[in-house]
C-alpha cells in the first residue's frame, strides 16, 4: 500500500549527492544543527556523524515514525514531530539550519528561518526558480531577505537526484547572516515601503518633488536597473521626508 507522504516530498537518496551536500555544509564537530524535514533520515544520519547535535523536525507522521525507528540508537539526534512553521527556534543558542523544503512552502519557510531564528548560517535545498526569486530585488521577498542575509548558490541538483523525480531542478543555497541593513525600529516602515515600491505605487510614498530628490540622491537613472543599495538609499530618503530620521 502506498503511503501518503504529506506535501508530496521528493527525497534525496543518492549517496554521492548526499556526500557532496555534506561537504558544502562545512560543518564542525562542535556545531549544533536544526534540520528541516527528517524525511527518511538519509541526510540526518550524515549530519549526526560530523556535528555535535542534530535536532530534526518532521511533520509527516509516517516519515517521523520511520526515521524514529531508524535513528533511535543515535544519541546525537533528537527528532521532533511538528510543523516547522510552528516550531520555535532557540534565542540564545548558537546553531545552523539545514533543510530540503517543500517547493510550495518555500516562501513561508525561508521567511521563518531568516526572521524567526538566530542561525548564523542557513543551508536550504530549494527549487532553482525560487532561488532566483530570492535574488530579485524587484520582488518584495528579495528586498526583505537581503536586509538580513547574503544568499549564494553552492550546488546544482538536477531533478534526477530526487525520488520521485520532480519536474524542476533544485539548488543548494547558503544564507549567511550579516548585520541588519534596517534597524528594528524601522522594520514596519520598511515592509510598508517595500510593498508599495515593488508595486510601483510611488505616489503612496513620495510627492513628485520628493521622488525626484530621492532618485537623484540614490543616483538612479533607470528604475529597471535599480540596485539593492539604491533601494536602501531611497528608503532612507523616505524616512527623512517623513521625519523619522
From Swiss-Prot:
Q: Which residues bind S-adenosyl-L-methionine?
A: 10, 12, 37, 58, 83, 100
Q: Name the InterPro entries on file.
A: KsgA/Erm (IPR001737), rRNA_Ade_diMease-like_C (IPR023165), rRNA_Ade_Mease_Trfase_CS (IPR020596), rRNA_Ade_methylase_Trfase_N (IPR020598), SAM-dependent_MTases_sf (IPR029063)
Q: Which UniProt keywords apply?
A: Antibiotic resistance, Methyltransferase, Plasmid, RNA-binding, S-adenosyl-L-methionine, Transferase
Tell me the superkingdom of the source: Bacteria
The EC designation for this entry is: 2.1.1.184
Q: Its GO CC terms? A: cytosol
Q: Name the SMART domains for this protein.
A: rADc
Record's catalysed reaction(s): adenosine(2085) in 23S rRNA + 2 S-adenosyl-L-methionine = N(6)-dimethyladenosine(2085) in 23S rRNA + 2 S-adenosyl-L-homocysteine + 2 H(+)
Which NCBIfam families is this protein grouped with? Erm23S_rRNA_broad, erm_B_23S_MT
Protein name from the UniProt record: rRNA adenine N-6-methyltransferase
Amino acid at each position: 500500500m502506498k503511503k501518503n507522504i504529506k506535501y508530496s516530498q521528493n527525497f534525496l537518496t543518492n549517496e554521492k549527492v548526499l556526500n557532496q551536500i555534506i561537504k558544502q555544509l562545512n560543518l564542525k564537530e562542535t556545531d549544533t544543527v536544526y534540520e528541516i524535514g527528517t524525511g527518511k533520515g538519509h541526510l540526518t544520519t550524515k549530519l549526526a556523524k560530523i556535528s555535535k547535535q542534530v535536532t530534526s523536525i518532521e511533520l509527516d507522521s509516517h516519515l517521523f515514525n520511520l526515521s524514529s525507528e531508524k535513528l533511535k540508537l543515535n544519541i546525537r539526534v533528537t527528532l521532533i514531530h511538528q510543523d516547522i512553521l510552528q516550531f520555535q527556534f532557540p534565542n540564545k543558542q548558537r546553531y545552523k539550519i539545514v533543510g530540503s523544503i517543500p517547493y510550495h512552502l518555500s516562501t513561508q519557510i525561508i521567511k521563518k528561518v531568516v526572521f524567526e531564528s538566530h542561525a548564523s548560517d542557513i543551508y536550504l535545498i530549494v527549487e532553482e526558480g525560487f532561488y532566483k526569486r530570492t535574488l530579485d530585488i524587484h520582488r518584495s521577498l528579495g528586498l526583505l531577505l537581503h536586509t538580513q542575509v547574503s544568499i549564494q548558490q553552492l550546488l546544482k541538483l538536477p531533478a534526477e537526484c530526487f525520488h520521485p523525480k520532480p519536474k524542476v531542478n533544485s539548488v543548494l543555497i547558503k544564507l549567511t547572516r550579516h548585520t541588519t541593513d534596517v534597524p528594528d525600529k524601522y522594520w514596519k516602515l520598511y515592509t510598508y515601503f517595500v510593498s508599495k515600491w515593488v508595486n510601483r505605487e510611488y505616489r503612496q510614498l513620495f510627492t513628485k518633488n520628493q521622488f525626484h530628490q530621492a532618485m537623484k540622491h540614490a543616483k538612479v537613472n533607470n528604475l529597471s536597473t535599480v540596485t539593492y543599495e539604491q533601494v536602501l538609499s531611497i528608503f532612507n530618503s523616505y524616512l527623512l521626508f517623513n521625519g523619522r530620521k
